Amino acid sequence: MQKIDANKIIDEAKFNPFHWMVLFWCALIIIFDGYDLVIYGVVLPVLMKEWNLSPLEAGALGSYALFGMMAGALIFGPLSDKIGRKKAITICVVLFSGFTVLNGFATNPTEFGICRFIAGLGIGGVMPNVVALMSEYAPKKIRSTLVAIMFSGYSVGGMLSAGLGIVLLPNFGWQ
């Protein structure tokens, strides 16, 4: 009976449309991930004025997402080994997208901070999983290049957040 080494097949594969699809979806998720993290900085001046926040309070409010990211990475990284990467990524995307949308309905800093923390769980949880997914499917010769391209989406998301904020914030407000 012949044995098949799946890792060897993946490592030696030629870059093909399947790899493009994995790269596209992972990069798109990272773009939204970057957008969701940076959007706080875009609305920060308005929030400070509207809620009369001191710089210290505003900084603390912003750090809740970072605490969530740390916890999310530690929770969803290992969890994906049990439930699968796609399920873990889906849960994380729902968390960071849903709670970022809910942030728009926050009426006070406490509600906003809770939403930022929970969104941070998804933001941090998606990171190790898209890296692992891209690494697992990428041919060995271009693995680090594909991960680097995918991660550049994080900066793209941040720039989109700032660019859209410049256009939308003056016309529609932060909510």
Regions flagged by a language model, labelled:
Residues M1-Q175:
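Transmembrane-helix signature of 12-pass secondary carriers
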